[in-house]
Design a protein with these regions (language model features):
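Non-catalytic alpha-helical scaffolds and adjoining flexible linkers that form interface surfaces
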Residues: 2-261
Length: 261
């Protein structure tokens, strides 16, 4: 299926000039109260990457922007583009991800995914792949047949792929051989073959773990959440990604603490 934001952008139909209205398709990543009734929101958009916007009166109980300016809200946002900021005029929300927010654990995972997308995305940059990944991942959280821990592993690894800092799981990092890959080395950022594994410290992987990582890295976004794994495989995936993120991202995500409760 197509993503809901693959259709023609309306940005040029309203205006692309500063000081006029623009329509951007995106998702609310975070919000912050401003004054008594206003909000400042961070949006990840198809057209302009990450943007910050102000929503006047969005905290009033009768405001049409109350629900539209909440985390996870996805849709089209019509905004006035000023010299240094955007101001939300109205929004047409196509998905609030309400099913996700009805489950506390799913909500915690969702906020972690939003925070990671916020960390990796930039303003005035093409972030469509991150937006697509985020949308697909939140949809997966609403699927009770997929373990949330597996969804997290898939999301983290694919985010690394999009940002070009993913491990090499297709050949040995020391000799380049593509056969008999047995150990994963965080230090080497990838796999080691049987011959080289004796010279380096690594994690001995089950074949299913290697296949899962290869699938996640090479698959299109729409195919990511189409498989499950055993508990043993899942634990190794978690071990690998935890160590890899610690070394190559080295950022503390505040929402991650709630996933350990």
């Amino acid at each position: 299926m197509d993503f809901p934001f693959m259709k023609q952008s309306k940005e040029g139909e309203v205006s692309g000039k500063m000081g006029q209205s623009v329509v951007l398709t995106g998702m609310v990543l975070q919000t912050m109260p401003i004054g008594e009734y206003d909000k400042r929101i961070t949006l990840l958009t198809k057209e302009r990457g990450k943007v910050t916007a102000f929503a006047k009166g969005a905290r009033r109980p009768n405001s049409s922007l109350l629900a539209a300016c909440a985390p996870f809200a996805f849709g089209e946002f019509e905004m006035y583009e000023g010299r240094t900021s955007y101001n939300v005029k109205k929004a047409d929300i196509s998905n609030y991800f309400r099913e996700l927010t009805m489950e506390l654990e799913c909500t915690y995972y969702g906020f972690y995914f939003l925070e990671m997308a916020d960390y990796f995305s930039q303003e005035n940059n093409d972030e469509q792949e991150i937006l697509k990944l985020l949308y697909q991942t939140l949809k997966a959280l609403e699927n009770p047949s997929l373990p949330n821990r597996l969804i997290r592993c898939i999301y983290e690894l694919k985010m690394l792929v999009i940002n070009g800092i993913y491990p090499n799981v297709f050949s040995c990092q020391l000799c380049g051989k593509r056969e008999n890959l047995v150990d994963f080395s965080v230090e080497r950022a990838g796999m080691l073959c049987m011959e080289c594994a004796g010279r380096e410290r690594g994690i001995r992987l089950e074949d299913s773990v290697l296949y899962a990582m290869q699938f996640i890295i090479s698959s299109e976004l729409r195919s990511l959440y189409t498989f499950t794994v055993s508990e043993a495989v899942l634990k190794q995936l978690e071990q690998i990604l935890f160590g890899y993120l610690q070394k190559y991202v080295a950022h503390t995500f505040k929402s991650e603490q709630f996933l350990c409760l």
